[in-house]
Amino acid sequence: MDPKESLTPPSREEIPSSVLGRERAHVMDFYKSLRGGTPVKVSAASPSLAAVSQPDSKQQRLAVDFPKGSGSNAQQPDLSKAVSLSMGLYMGETETKVMGSDLGFPQQGQISLSSGETDFRLLEESIANLSRSTSVPENPKSSASAAGPAAPAEKAFPKTHSDGAPEQPNVKGQTGTNGGNVKLFTTDQSTFDIWRKKLQDLELPSGSPGKETSESPWSSDLLIDENCLLSPLAGEEDPFLLEGSSTEDCKPLVLPDTKPKVKDNGELILPSPNSVPLPQVKTEKEDFIELCTPGVIKQEKLGPAYCQASFSGANIIGGKMSAISVHGVSTSGGQLYHYDMNTAASLSKQQEQKPLFNVIPPIPVGSENWNRCQGSGDDNLTSLGTLNFSGRSVFSNGYSSPGMRPDVSSPPSSSSAATGPPPKLCLVCSDEASGCHYGVLTCGSCKVFFKRAVEGQHNYLCAGRNDCIIDKIRRKNCPACRYRKCLQAGMNLEARKTKKKIKGIQQATTGVSQETSENSANKTIVPATLPQLTPTLVSLLEVIEPEVLYAGYDSSIPDSTWRIMTALNMLGGRQVIAAVKWAKAIPGFRNLHLDDQMTLLQYSWMFLMVFALGWRSYRQSSASLLCFAPDLVINEQRMALPCMYDQCRHMLYVSSELQRLQVSYEEYLCMKTLLLLSSVPKDGLKSQELFDEIRMTYIKELGKAIVKREGNSSQNWQRFYQLTKLLDSMHDVVENLLNYCFQTFLDKTMSIEFPEMLAEIITNQLPKYSSGNIKKLLFHQK
């Protein structure tokens, strides 16, 4: 049966006129004998149980519009209280929201009446029966009645429960009058019998929202306007709901048991005003969800703090699909909307924790909690879990919904525990670095090791092949490889001193800036000479220094001149290869022409090996022994062998001079580089200008090394003279050694072996020495 047909008056004679309420859609007709005028349009507020008026009650009058042509009718009595108590309604505009306390009535418990569960029918009663009933409270909207016969009023059935019993209005027995003694309802039970009979004839459709949920605050009447669907949530004129508001705190509406209870004598047992709880529906303004269709509330399994409103299918009204507007995007089908169901503590919690508008920024955590709540939904409902809340500030009022607040009790994710910058590692041993020491990010252990190694001038020797693994566990196994790795990383004592100088300059400039004026204090004081934080040439030379090689000499076998000379030649061949690699790593050397590089190496290979031998002998044995290798040391006993003493005496001269002058490691590195550049062809090099520039650069580096060792003293030039004099004397030493080397190379009867690399160099060098095409670059004239 069509719900509209069941609610239509039977005939025109029986019902002169019926008016549909525009705002809340409650139909009320007033009989002509009582009204005395044409039908009036009355708007009803939210359904609530009206109380009985008292004589001294305040009467708030509201205007009622009448049709044209009714101005000639007689003055109508005041109908501001013309609402039946049994109808469970009170009259008033939606904007004014007149409550029972405003009309001066004793305030009764209010019961929200679902419009989908109430049907309005004519009561086929006579005016005489109506006159015996209680008078209708005066209508606050009627200011003056029009002349003419009274319009009959259409009565409404009380709210019924699922068992079909009518709901008993809250009446205390008072009778109100309409300016006279005319009573609208009798005090006996005849009225309720008629209601029950009419209610049985009423057939509600099976799909009616009233049958689906009996106490849902979102259920609405089938004949009301679509604009009234939000009436249980907020007022009609609420701009936040029209522009996309949501329910922030939705309390469950619990209706009391209002079945009529009758005593044996026929009197009604009415509950006291304090015994009936006041159901309230609290609405909070939100910014991104607009509920525009009735729904069913159900509790989610994920937690007691949330419930969801499910919607499915098409709405009956107008055949339109029910939808939820999320950020202005309308969705249809099954939708989910979450409400905060903490009815006990949410009100006080809201008042304390609700942030102010435009003061506290919105909390951007809505999507996380939303996704967590979507876990128990259907597959077609999970689309809302992927909403992007990044642009929410456009719609936000300055705060977020309590349902969207972060869950502080949730355990942190495993990924958050692993977040953070990775630890910095030492560039030497890969341990955790403690800071930047000597210009390199290192640990404290490598910092102390490097300082002691440099200041103690230790000459570490590797027991292996100079390729030991240096890590946190094995860094103490080989100090030679560890020290080499420190140099390769770029550690330099100059960096520490430079840092101290910078700190001192900054402190000095800070003191000066405090004494100057305000304008000069704002200027940045830059030192005249910026300290050089880049690695110096000496530090680079330390890094590229060749490793100590082993001869592989078997000391268990008796020594002989042939055996020792062969072992020295084989060791010399590997040292030449290492010298070639070292020369190519010298800054600026590879900029020379390739022929010039080969020529310089052919002229200087003996200089390099003898000077390095003298340094090792000076550091290891205080110039008393010749330390060719860790496993091949020439002592006095071996020097006494035939053809060995004279050659060893020339070599010991170099180590003794280094011992006498106490040459530092930086000075040794610069002198060794200058020996590479100490001999050139007589006709010059192809890159002569570049060669001269490179040589002058390392001469200056030698001067810096002297200053570093001696400080700013008058002995610097004297030491520079002594060191350069030693470099000049190296030509005589090398010349004697080359002559003996060429002799043994050419004399096949001695059967002394030469490695391939060394034999090739000697073969190319012999013609040049024989022709005298060699120019010695000396610092001092003889």
Curated annotation (Swiss-Prot):
Similarity comment text for this entry: Belongs to the nuclear hormone receptor family. NR3 subfamily.
Ranges of residues in domain NR LBD: 529-763
Species assigned in the record: Sus scrofa (Pig)
Modified residues (Phosphothreonine): T8
Gene name of the record: NR3C1
Record field: compositional bias (Low complexity): 140-155
Name of the protein in question: Glucocorticoid receptor
UniProt modification remark: Acetylation by CLOCK reduces its binding to glucocorticoid response elements and its transcriptional activity. Increased proteasome-mediated degradation in response to glucocorticoids.
Cross-link (Glycyl lysine isopeptide (Lys-Gly) (interchain with G-Cter in SUMO2)): K263, K282, K298
Residues annotated with Phosphoserine modification: S46, S114, S135, S142, S208, S216, S231, S272, S312, S410
Sites of Omega-N-methylarginine modification: R24
GO function term, MF aspect, one: zinc ion binding
Zinc finger (NR C4-type): 426-446, 462-486
Segments of this protein annotated with the region Modulating: 1-425
Residues in the DNA-binding region annotation: 426-491
Record-listed cross-link Glycyl lysine isopeptide (Lys-Gly) (interchain with G-Cter in ubiquitin), residues: K424
Region spans: Disordered: 1-20, 48-79, 130-184
Gene3D superfamilies xref list: Erythroid Transcription Factor GATA-1, subunit A (3.30.50.10), Retinoid X Receptor (1.10.565.10)
Gene Ontology CC: one annotated term: spindle
Protein's UniProt keywords contain Mitochondrion: yes
Residues found modified as N6-acetyllysine: K485, K497, K499, K500
GO biological process, one term: cellular response to steroid hormone stimulus
UniProt region (Interaction with CLOCK), positions on chain: 490-782
Subunit structure: Heteromultimeric cytoplasmic complex with HSP90AA1, HSPA1A/HSPA1B, and FKBP5 or another immunophilin such as PPID, STIP1, or the immunophilin homolog PPP5C. Upon ligand binding FKBP5 dissociates from the complex and FKBP4 takes its place, thereby linking the complex to dynein and mediating transport to the nucleus, where the complex dissociates. Probably forms a complex composed of chaperones HSP90 and HSP70, co-chaperones CDC37, PPP5C, TSC1 and client protein TSC2, CDK4, AKT, RAF1 and NR3C1; this complex does not contain co-chaperones STIP1/HOP and PTGES3/p23. Directly interacts with UNC45A.
Superkingdom of the source species: Eukaryota
